[in-house]
Amino acid sequence: MSGEPRKILVTSALPYANGPIHLGHLLEYIQTDIWVRFQKLRGHQCTYVCADDAHGTAIMLKAEQMGITPEQLIDQVNADHRRDFAEFLIEFDNYYSTHSEENRELSSYIYKACLDAGKIATRTITQAYDPEKNLFLADRFIKGTCPKCKAEDQYGDNCEVCSSTYTPAELINPRSAISGATPIEKESTHFFFKLPDFQEFLQKWTRSGTLQPQIANKLAEWLDAGLQEWDISRDAPYFGFEIPDQPGKFFYVWLDAPIGYMASFKNLCARRADLDFDEYWKKDSTAELYHFIGKDIINFHALFWPSMLSCADFRTPSAVYAHGFVTVDGAKMSKSRGTFIMARTYLEHLNPEYLRYYFAAKLTSNVDDLDLNLQDFTLKVNADLVGKLVNIASRCAKFITKAGGKLSPQISEPELIEQFLSKSDFIAQAYEDREFGKAVREIMALADLANKYIDEKAPWKLAKEEGKEQEVLDVCSVGVNLFRILITYLAPVLPGVAAASAEFLNAPIVWNRPLEPLTDHAVNEFKPMISRVDPKAVDAMVDASKDNMAQAPKDNGKAKKDKKEAKSEEEIAPTIKFDDFAKIDLRIAKIVSAEHVEGADKLLRLQLDIGSEQRQVFAGIKSAYAPEDLVGRLTVMVANLEPRKMKFGMSEGMVLAAGPGGKDIWLLQPDSGAQPGMQVK
């Protein structure tokens, strides 16, 4: 590493304090933790803070249902979150709560700064109101019959069966999801942040390199359409911070939630003499500030948040990094249907480092969704971590122990060692760029070389020959040094295995200076570092999750039931000859660009890179995908389909997708490692 150590502050989005962590949440915290551990391993002062998002109507109502106070609920959830994160080896420098005095003070300060700057408006609005509970109802707290498909028990703003959107007033037989009462309309005075006043600032900021291209393009659409004022207030009863000088009015949870990043850091600064709040948050700060978030909350972090910070004379983020969602075996996760695996359920059955590695192997810097394919998960972890990585150390250690437990005084293969060390900068840059999958592929390619070297030298055969003791020690000492380099590169991903490796190697894992090979160095007895994934344990985890799903509320909408039955009854097509199938040329394609087609309700225009050329394809996937979410993705296309002339242009192939249509369309996506132009066989 060269240059002065960087000062970096990193955050992950705040998990909501009304329930447990699940695998969909964990993608973000694992991604962030790997990046932070990498920065620390490289010698930088990198600080990682987070907190529970602990305000809002949902928390107030859940506490009431449980017969406890909101404070008791958020304390209980906070303890559960801390426990689960710790067991997944997520190492926060501070994990706090938005329900804190630091956050109250900072939220009030920022609000008053915006008020003094003339950026807060006041006006009267009409909302749905529960006359029994005496509270205003957000759309999600109103249920009724869909006005389009007549499915029952649908939310106040959208139908989960037919995907229609509407207003609560259009809902048939609306009722409060809290009390069952019929809502009435009632007026209230609300406070609004004048976001349109920051249009010019945001147009520049969102194009300044702070966002991924796909995200910047999406925000450009919103900016071009014109920004609306943002309602930052809620009426009592509400669990949160009361707005200064406005009795009965509270800050909307999304106002004080991101300020929770600042509050958590301020709380840490009070306990750490080496950290200064202003050094990281003042307007002219030279420290780096990064937010890792899900793509679904980008509007709060890339529009509202930088605008409020700028208005209150604080610095804005160096970058906001968004990621996609987690799917399991190709299906979208859904809380309402219970199709997710809880963090605690996973931990009861499997090693957390399995998931850390699998996520890392598939993570890129873009916003594509990540699929947790459980069969691939088992095969990949067993092949890479057990069959390749740890196998190197276990194959060599017993011979070194037999020779006295000390490595050879010389390195017999300096060129091979140098080949491994020469990849340091490439792998480090991949981590820096959040291209974890690229880093993992390079590391595993090196692991293959290390195992090939040991196979060719066959120390187990040499050990049977008289007078070959030194050669055996030389070979195995090279193997152990290669393992040390590999585990150094993987330490951000596998901190537990790295710690066990450091114990075996009798040397710390360091990556902030050139690695010198270990020679004439005593190592400790080798102990198993990670075991194979047991498919039965995976099955047991899935079964336990199914038990959780069975306890979830059942859907009463006949339309949804009919829809599911229709999916399952789709018949297999008639049998064809193999020669007929062989005529189809399927290729890996990279989506270079994607855009709406004027005048087409269902089509997106895709520009596809298939290695030797680019093709234009019109795909009927508009109902399921936003164009900006597709750019950079790999998919599969029929490359030898006769071009079809359409009124919008020539379509030069077909991309492959699954699903019945509407929002239920899933574009095929190959595993990481596939390259544009590769033939699918």
UniProtKB/Swiss-Prot annotation:
EC number: 6.1.1.10
Catalytic function, reaction form: tRNA(Met) + L-methionine + ATP = L-methionyl-tRNA(Met) + AMP + diphosphate
Free-text cofactor note: Binds 1 zinc ion per subunit.
Binding site for Zn(2+): C146, C149, C159, C162
UniProt xrefs under InterPro entries: aa-tRNA-synth_I_CS, Anticodon_Met, Met-tRNA-synth_bsu_C, Met-tRNA_ligase_1, Met-tRNA_synth, Methionyl/Leucyl_tRNA_Synth, MetRS_core, MetRS_Zn
Pfam families in UniProt: Anticodon_3, tRNA-synt_1g, tRNA_bind
UniProt xrefs under PANTHER family: METHIONINE--TRNA LIGASE, METHIONINE--TRNA LIGASE, CYTOPLASMIC
Protein name as catalogued: Methionine--tRNA ligase
Species in which this protein is naturally found: Hahella chejuensis (strain KCTC 2396)
